[in-house]
């Protein structure tokens, strides 16, 4: 499986000056946990990290120190995540048929989750890891913040990554979005807008996206528990 990891990760909400993916988490940079888990998935055979030029040296060194069993390639990203993913798709080897896309900030995804998503692509043309919503969701008027209605949660799932699909179709979807100035927050949404079915793959409750300092504390606690159970990360 070919894997793209968007890793721009500006740390404004973390209170960090640089890339939040280079912040320490349980003794190693946050991105190192993401890479290690991805490389441990048996089907992973190629990883492309998409980032900004100012982070290239640090990320290259990080990947080198990990000594991963799969090749890791650097891809210069664009101004937005969507542009960066498109650049990543264009940089894939010509033999790539399916691709997974995983946010670098989701550093707790397990190798098993990568494998489930890769296996699903043998059957479905587009997939997204997701978990059922547990909270009650309120739709709110934006100006007054008054509740408009409560949305039944039985059919609601919280999207995660990995997401992925057929390389040709994803390239076409991103090219279409660029031409039409369509902006989305994840790759599955592009497939949806193009009328393509997207299959949900059961995600993981621990697969949180590190966005705030509180997320970092939660991730630290989860990792400590996991490392006690299995000391080899």
UniProtKB/Swiss-Prot annotation:
Q: Which HAMAP family match?
A: IspD
Pathway it acts in?
A: Isoprenoid biosynthesis; isopentenyl diphosphate biosynthesis via DXP pathway; isopentenyl diphosphate from 1-deoxy-D-xylulose 5-phosphate: step 2/6
Q: Which SUPFAM superfamilies match?
A: Nucleotide-diphospho-sugar transferases
What gene name is given for the protein in this entry?
ispD
What does the function comment of this entry state? Catalyzes the formation of 4-diphosphocytidyl-2-C-methyl-D-erythritol from CTP and 2-C-methyl-D-erythritol 4-phosphate (MEP).
**Which controlled-vocabulary keywords does the entry list?**
Isoprene biosynthesis, Nucleotidyltransferase, Transferase
A biological process term (GO) from this entry: isopentenyl diphosphate biosynthetic process, methylerythritol 4-phosphate pathway
Q: Where is this site: Positions MEP for the nucleophilic attack?
A: 153, 209
The entry's family comment says: Belongs to the IspD/TarI cytidylyltransferase family. IspD subfamily.
Q: Name one GO molecular function term.
A: 2-C-methyl-D-erythritol 4-phosphate cytidylyltransferase activity
Enzyme class comes to transferase
This one is known as 2-C-methyl-D-erythritol 4-phosphate cytidylyltransferase
- Gene3D superfamilies associated with the record: Spore Coat Polysaccharide Biosynthesis Protein SpsA, Chain A
Which residues carry the site feature described as Transition state stabilizer?
Answer: 13, 20
Name the reaction it catalyses.
2-C-methyl-D-erythritol 4-phosphate + CTP + H(+) = 4-CDP-2-C-methyl-D-erythritol + diphosphate
InterPro entries from the UniProt entry: IspD, IspD/TarI, IspD/TarI_cytidylyltransf_bact, ISPD_synthase_CS, Nucleotide-diphossugar_trans
Under PROSITE patterns, the record lists: ISPD (PS01295)
Please state the Enzyme Commission number of this protein: 2.7.7.60
Q: What is the lineage of its organism?
A: Bacteria, Bacillati, Cyanobacteriota, Cyanophyceae, Gloeobacterales
Domain of life from the UniProt record: Bacteria
């Amino acid at each position: 499986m070919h894997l793209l990891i968007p890793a721009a990760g500006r740390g404004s909400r973390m209170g960090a000056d640089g890339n939040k993916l280079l912040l320490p988490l349980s003794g190693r940079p946050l991105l190192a946990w993401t890479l290690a888990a991805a490389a441990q998935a048996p089907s992973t055979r190629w990883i492309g990290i998409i980032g900004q030029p100012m982070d290239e040296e640090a990320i290259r060194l990080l990947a080198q120190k990990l000594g991963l069993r799969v090749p890791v390639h650097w891809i210069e990203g664009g101004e937005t995540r969507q542009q960066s993913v498109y650049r990543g798709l264009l940089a894939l080897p010509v033999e790539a048929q399916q691709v997974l896309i995983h946010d670098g900030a989701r550093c707790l995804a397990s190798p098993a989750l990568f494998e489930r998503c890769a296996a699903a692509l043998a059957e479905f043309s587009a997939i997204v890891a997701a978990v059922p919503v547990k909270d009650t969701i309120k739709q709110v008027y934006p100006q007054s913040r008054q509740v408009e209605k409560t949305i039944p949660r039985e059919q609601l799932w919280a999207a995660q990554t990995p997401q992925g699909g057929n390389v040709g179709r994803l390239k076409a979807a991103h090219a279409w979005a660029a031409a039409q100035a369509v902006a989305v927050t994840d790759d599955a949404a592009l497939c949806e807008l193009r009328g393509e079915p997207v299959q949900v793959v059961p995600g993981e409750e621990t697969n949180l996206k590190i966005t705030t300092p509180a997320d970092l504390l939660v991730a630290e606690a989860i990792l400590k528990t996991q490392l006690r159970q299995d000391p080899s990360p």
